[in-house]
Amino acid sequence: MKKALALLMSLALVLAMTVGAMAAEDWVTPVQNIENWDEEVDFLIVGYGLAGAAAAVEAHDIDPNAKILVLEKMPETLAGGNSIASGQTFLVPAESAVETVKTYLYNCNLPNPIPDEYLTWLCNGFATQLPWIEYVADGVDYEAGYVGGGELKWGSMVVEFSNFEGSTFDGCSAHLRAKGATFENGGVWRCFAKAVEKRGIDVRF
């Protein structure tokens, strides 16, 4: 009886998957067959976490006349992706620490190492990102500071995997919060979300 029931359930599952696949084939049109689109934009950004919000801000500031659309699968009350639940800081290594950070990230991604050209670009961006972050923050009355309050504190940092070569380097950890506050829960993402809103960028949940 149990074997028969298990077989019946398996057949039902296979049937459901088959019907679902057939239904999908009926309503999903290959992109090369689409002649007319309901809407066209200059920049389409999928995901409204910190990366999506930052991309939207940068796209707008490069071309204020560009049509930008951000799509987020979650409801607006749960927007922010992983970014809103993270430690709420940016890692900003000193420019003198770029090679050390490259070594650390290289070791973090073994046995599938990141190409050196990309690592160089990424780490140079880490080390020079702070002025842009402060520019975005200032535009919505936010500021970058130490996560416990006060100004940024530069010095020796040890990141997550301290057993990896390159895990210790000079830099700071920058938290974003409303001006005058000491800490804001979700402040890093909320700052960029406010910057997106200020620019009138279309976000759909």
Feature-to-residue mapping (PLM):
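Gly/Ala-rich phosphate-binding loop of Rossmann-like dinucleotide-binding domains
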Residues: A56, H60
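Positively charged n-region of N-terminal signal peptides that target proteins for export
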Residues: M1-M9
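Conserved Rossmann-like nucleotide-cofactor binding loop
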Residues: A51, A55, E76
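Glycine-rich active-site loop/strand segments that organize a redox cofactor
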Residues: G87-N124, Q129
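Beta1/beta-strand and adjacent pyrophosphate-binding region of the FAD-binding site
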Residues: I34-A51, L69
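Sec-dependent signal peptide cleavage junction
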Residues: L15-W27
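Conserved redox-cofactor binding core of oxidoreductases
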Residues: N124-F205
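Glycine-rich FAD pyrophosphate-binding loop
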Residues: D61-S83
